[in-house]
């Protein structure tokens, strides 16, 4: 869940909010969940063009904007909420403790990437 949230923030937040340069995952051609889901939704011709542009390092800001405005983002958010929900359910079996409370809060925070 943490990695998915980080991938979302790389596309959706500002550099001031995240404390890092945005779009670095795309610039480094990292296969993130948002990228994978977005590519799967594209027609084949557009998918090949996007992959070519990514591998050449061109049009990164445009591709980041396309991903962030696509239906893929809703899908990725849904997957993130699912993982956080699963984590919360697993925590119910643990005895009450400060660690359990901290993990529960972490799952809650991670489920809201913006």
What are the language-model segments listed below?
Residues 1-114:
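All-alpha prenyltransferase/terpene-synthase fold signal
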């Amino acid at each position: 869940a943490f990695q998915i949230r980080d991938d979302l923030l790389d596309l959706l937040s500002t550099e001031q909010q995240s404390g890092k340069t945005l779009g670095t995952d795309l610039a480094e051609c990292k296969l993130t969940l948002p990228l994978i889901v977005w590519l799967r939704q594209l027609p084949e011709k557009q998918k090949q063009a996007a992959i070519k542009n990514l591998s050449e390092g061109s049009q990164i800001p445009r591709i980041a904007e396309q991903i962030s405005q696509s239906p893929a983002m809703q899908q990725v958010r849904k997957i993130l909420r699912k993982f956080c929900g699963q984590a919360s359910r697993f925590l119910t079996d643990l005895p009450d403790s400060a660690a359990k409370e901290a993990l529960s809060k972490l799952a809650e925070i991670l489920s809201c990437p913006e």
